[in-house]
Amino acid sequence: QTHFYNILENNAAYDFQFNGESTRLKVNIKQVLMSDDWDAVTFQQVSQAAPHFATYEPYLSALADYVRTYLPHTKFYMHQTWAYEAGSERLKNAGFDTPQEMLEHIRSAYQAAADRIGASGIIPSGDAMFKALENGMEIVHRDTFHASLGFGRYLLGLVWYGFFTGRSVKHIPFDAFDVPVSDKEREIAARTAAAVLGTTL
């Protein structure tokens, strides 16, 4: 919804980054779209609304149509958000008893969204965060809803890398973590990402 109104009002509401570095430029969505010949554009719903497909429209379709105006050949993808931490107030306030219940609603909503805009796929970040807990991680959030700065962000990075490149996520040399990630956590992250992507290590 926020991005929809930013388009209508042509708001320069975004910090433009290039290869992860700030340019200190404030830009609008049109400027971002026109800044390169993007081959992929991802969409996601804000986490608290993500389980409820009714909140996606009419904004999602309008945003997709707007992007198509400037990038007629780009592929669309939905970036699946994740469930809140078990036992947290945020989970309770969202109306769910368990993270699994919230994730099931997220999956359904994202599939409906992908179908609605003709997306080429869904980046399974929510599935990865949940699977990591099953694979032995005790904590994947830093504040019950954002990904943890070490393991969580690394896991999500592996999911994106594997999803878009099709390459193995086993031996990734990245080491510039905000919070240390142990060798065991690296192994869990790689195994988890491979599992949700349906690939082998």
Task: Identify the role of each PLM range.
Residues Q45-A54, E85-P99:
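Surface-exposed cleft-lining segments at the edges of enzyme active sites
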Residues D65-F76, A119:
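A short helix->loop->beta-strand "cap" motif at the edges of active sites that frequently abuts
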